[in-house]
């Protein structure tokens, strides 16, 4: 590469791929939701549901602490299995936008909701908050299909430094492959 493209800044990485890894890649590609656990989501008492005949969604906000815990207790390959792009990291040369997300979270967490576009997640199902606990949404399975940069940046902040930020999120249930 260096002799044919001397001006190009190209880095080549190699990984050993065996049957287990190939099978894992196949499973991730054939099912967009690869994280099958169930989670309780603190919604701070806010949210609403939208339904059509083909899908339903619950729109709410999650705390940065909840998102931080989700990222750090799951496998990114599974968490982002339905997303064509994984978390890209942050730094001056890597990704200035993610660096900006991190700085906003640290400097002005209470305004983060206004700065951030939010997250879209596919789930197998959810149970809306009821009168016994208006602050909890129960979800089954999850893959983040939009918001990997926000999720990864929040997850990369050191424990105890996440702050009181809230992040917009949509939890969508849809089995129609022409829509998802």
Residues covered by each model-derived region:
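Active-site ExK catalytic segment of metal-dependent nucleases
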Residues: 1, 120, 168-172
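N-terminal extension/subdomain marker
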Residues: 1-111
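A general secondary-structure signal for short beta-strands and their flanking turns/coil
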Residues: 7, 114, 162-164
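Conserved beta-strand termini and adjacent loop/short-helix elements that scaffold enzyme active sites
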Residues: 13-17, 122, 172-174
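A short acidic, often aromatic-flanked loop/helix-cap motif at beta-alpha or helix-coil junctions
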Residues: 17-24, 127-128, 176-178
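Alpha-helical structural motif
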Residues: 97, 115, 178-179
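Active-site-adjacent "gating/activation" loops or surface patches in catalytic cores
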Residues: 102-137
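Catalytic or ion-translocation cores adjacent to nucleophile or general acid/base/metal-coordination motifs
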Residues: 132-180
């Amino acid at each position: 590469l260096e002799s044919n493209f001397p001006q190009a800044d190209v880095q080549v990485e190699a990984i050993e791929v065996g049957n287990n890894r190939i099978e894992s890649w196949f499973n991730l590609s054939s099912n967009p939701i690869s994280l099958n656990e169930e989670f309780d989501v603190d919604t701070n008492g806010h949210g609403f549901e939208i339904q059509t005949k083909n899908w339903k969604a619950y729109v709410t906000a999650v705390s940065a602490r909840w998102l931080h815990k989700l990222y750090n207790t799951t496998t990114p390959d599974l968490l982002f299995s339905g997303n064509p792009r994984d978390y890209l990291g942050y730094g001056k040369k890597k990704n200035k936008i993610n660096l900006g997300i991190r700085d906003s979270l640290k400097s002005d967490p209470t305004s983060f909701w206004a700065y951030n576009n939010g997250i879209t997640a596919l789930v197998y199902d959810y149970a809306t908050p009821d009168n016994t606990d208006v602050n909890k949404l129960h979800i089954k399975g999850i893959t983040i299909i939009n918001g990997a940069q926000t999720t990864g940046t929040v997850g990369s902040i050191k424990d105890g430094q996440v702050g009181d930020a809230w992040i917009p999120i949509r939890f969508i249930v849809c089995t129609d492959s022409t829509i998802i």
